[in-house]
């Protein structure tokens, strides 16, 4: 164990021992093949843990357990109030173990401990509690139909759901999906990302302690091309929920179409963040920069296309570069770290290749673009100037700490250019003019628009994308629709 992992609690030290098992049908079991894989510490590149690798046979076992729990188990007949109590109990256990969960997320993903302690983990707990409250509030309608009939609707659970979780917010994204599925009465097979599986396996221990019936929640770490594909292909899975790249989302959608599975997709983005001439620059500059650099830029809705009015362009770019240079980089467990490493060697190489492509196409790296440390997967916060709309770094999702500064002249022009993207996940704008804010927000093609803020979330507010940024919505009451079927019941009232 590296020195960085020695800073963790005793309880987490215990968890980090041995080879971690899959959680299937209420039991911790090795993979059927005995295959294992390692997950590294992004701050050092050293192996953090070894885990059993779920493959097709393990996926089949997990799906069958979930199918049995849904079709025959006590979960199906459990009252909504009882289901709610189990979810609240899990949230309470997460609260009790919040320090371990925060440290584990930082070790596995690399993100700063201040972010996991004050952001990821509290939000994950909030989501579980939010959806626990929904268990008793899912209702249908009585509909005044013609004739001597009584007609009503029921919202019934869709069944067994496969949930494929990304590596950028591992536990939080799991809660986005798991909370809504449990509230509606579905059973779950959850595949965490192979890069960051540990918080999901720690969660499995808490699920076990909470007393969920066997088979209701199954957690199977493995690789997308094997476990993920087997889960998407499985005929006994009724729905797939996926967060990740648009490229993989398209493949999942195609595979799910073979059996007409329900699908929700939260995919990529290349979000615009517009600074209007009247913006409060003391707030807008750090706000827009953090809208890109948060979580090392590994955020699907990162505001990586920053549009700046041409009259303020040079001044704002210089200030953004200075602010970027002030951000402290280091290992996530160091409390003064503001920017941690990228999640993996592959992601590190991907981001560096985009930076080089930006330079090759004529953009100017005002700051950053380098690797500040010899060890680990670090990239210095990078600000590009002289960026044009058709450059690769202005069109494609980089998923790293790279800001592209783009000049504009008029409001209608910048709206058109902001919308000129295959993505439509989110957008931001900074202005002191409320009328202007509503005018622009109405015209931006994005599932979320932030005004004078960025990356603000709440469990009650929906999140999802237009265009190739996805299908359906996560969070809020809207997410419940993803996990229910609507049944219309007609009763003849004639004698």
Curated annotation (Swiss-Prot):
Disruption phenotype: No effect on vanillin degradation. SUPFAM superfamilies: ALDH-like (SSF53720). The keyword Oxidoreductase applies. The keyword Oxidoreductase applies. The active site is at residues 266, 300. NAD(+) binds at residues 244-249. This is Putative aldehyde dehydrogenase DhaS. It comes from Bacillus subtilis (strain 168). The lineage of its organism: Bacteria, Bacillati, Bacillota, Bacilli, Bacillales.
């Amino acid at each position: 164990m590296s020195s960085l992992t020695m800073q963790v609690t005793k309880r987490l030290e215990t968890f980090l021992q041995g080879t971690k098992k899959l959680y299937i049908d209420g039991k911790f079991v090795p993979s059927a093949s005995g295959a294992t894989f390692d997950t590294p510490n992004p701050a050092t590149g050293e192996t953090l843990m070894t885990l059993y690798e779920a493959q097709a046979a393990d996926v089949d076992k997990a799906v069958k357990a979930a199918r049995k729990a849904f079709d025959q188990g006590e979960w199906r007949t459990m009252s909504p109030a009882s289901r709610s109590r189990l979810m609240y109990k899990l949230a309470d256990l997460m609260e009790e173990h919040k320090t371990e969960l925060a440290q584990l997320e930082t070790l596995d993903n690399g993100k700063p401990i201040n972010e996991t302690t004050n952001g990821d983990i509290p939000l994950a707990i909030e989501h579980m509690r939010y959806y626990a409250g929904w268990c008793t509030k899912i209702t249908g309608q009585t509909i005044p139909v013609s004739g001597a009939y009584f007609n009503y609707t029921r919202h019934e659970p869709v069944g067994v759901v496969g949930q494929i979780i990304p590596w950028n917010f591992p536990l939080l994204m799991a809660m986005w999906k798991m909370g809504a599925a449990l509230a509606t009465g579905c059973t779950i097979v959850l595949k965490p990302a192979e890069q960051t599986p540990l918080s999901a396996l720690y969660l499995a221990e808490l699920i076990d302690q909470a007393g969920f019936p066997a088979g209701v929640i199954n957690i199977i770490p493995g690789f997308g091309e094997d476990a993920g594909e087997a889960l998407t292909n499985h005929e006994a899975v009724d729905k797939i929920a996926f967060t990740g790249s648009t490229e993989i989302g398209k493949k999942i959608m195609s595979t799910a179409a073979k059996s007409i599975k329900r699908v929700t997709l939260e995919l990529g983005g290349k979000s615009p963040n517009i600074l209007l001439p009247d913006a409060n620059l003391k707030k807008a500059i750090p706000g827009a920069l953090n809208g890109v650099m948060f979580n090392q830029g590994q955020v699907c809705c990162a505001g990586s296309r920053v549009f700046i009015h041409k009259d303020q362009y040079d001044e704002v770019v210089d200030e953004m570069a200075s602010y970027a240079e002030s951000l402290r980089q280091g290992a996530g467990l160091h409390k003064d770290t503001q920017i941690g490493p990228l999640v993996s060697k592959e992601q590190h190489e991907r981001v560096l290749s985009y930076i080089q492509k930006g330079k090759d196409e004529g953009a100017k790296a005002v700051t950053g673009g380098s690797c500040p440390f010899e060890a680990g997967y670090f990239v210095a916060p990078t600000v590009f100037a002289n960026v044009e709309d058709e450059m690769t770094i202005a069109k494609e999702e980089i998923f790293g700490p790279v800001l592209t500064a783009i000049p504009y002249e008029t409001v209608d022009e910048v709206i058109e250019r902001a919308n000129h993207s295959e993505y439509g996940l989110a957008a931001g704008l900074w202005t002191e003019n409320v009328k202007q804010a509503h005018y622009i927000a109405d015209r931006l093609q994005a599932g979320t628009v932030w005004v004078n803020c960025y990356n603000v979330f709440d469990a009650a507010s929906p999140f999802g994308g237009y265009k190739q940024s996805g299908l359906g919505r996560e969070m809020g009451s809207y997410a419940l629709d993803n996990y229910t079927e609507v049944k219309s019941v007609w009763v003849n009232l004639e004698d």
